[in-house]
């Protein structure tokens, strides 16, 4: 039972220790961007991914899962509309950030 408790209460730093070092700077950039969207942004550290939500309704707007050489993002604008994006290490963040911003602004 204590193992389950520990996994469920992992910090972002603990999560990143298990991730490929190549994707860590990109993960950090995405995390910083998500928190910049508003004071109501919360992160939920899961076993293999980090989910960013609006706190008042705990509606997630982006699910971020590190891979070996990329990051897999599921961006949710509504309960019925989810877009999957694979972000490579050398890819420009501007378009992806705009998709995340739009999801944050439209999710209820």
Task: Place the predicted regions along the sequence by residue.
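Charge-dense, helix-prone N-terminal extensions
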Residues: 1-108
């Amino acid at each position: 039972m204590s193992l389950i408790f520990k996994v469920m209460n992992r910090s972002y730093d603990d999560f990143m220790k298990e991730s490929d070092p190549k994707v860590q700077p990109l993960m950090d950039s995405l995390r910083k961007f998500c928190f910049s969207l508003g004071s109501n942004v919360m992160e939920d550290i899961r076993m293999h991914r980090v989910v960013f939500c609006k706190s008042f309704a705990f509606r997630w707007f982006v699910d971020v899962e590190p891979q070996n050489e990329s990051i897999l993002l599921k961006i949710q604008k509504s309960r019925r509309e989810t877009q999957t994006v694979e972000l490579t290490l050398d890819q420009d963040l501007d378009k992806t950030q705009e998709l995340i911003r739009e999801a944050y602004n439209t999710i209820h």
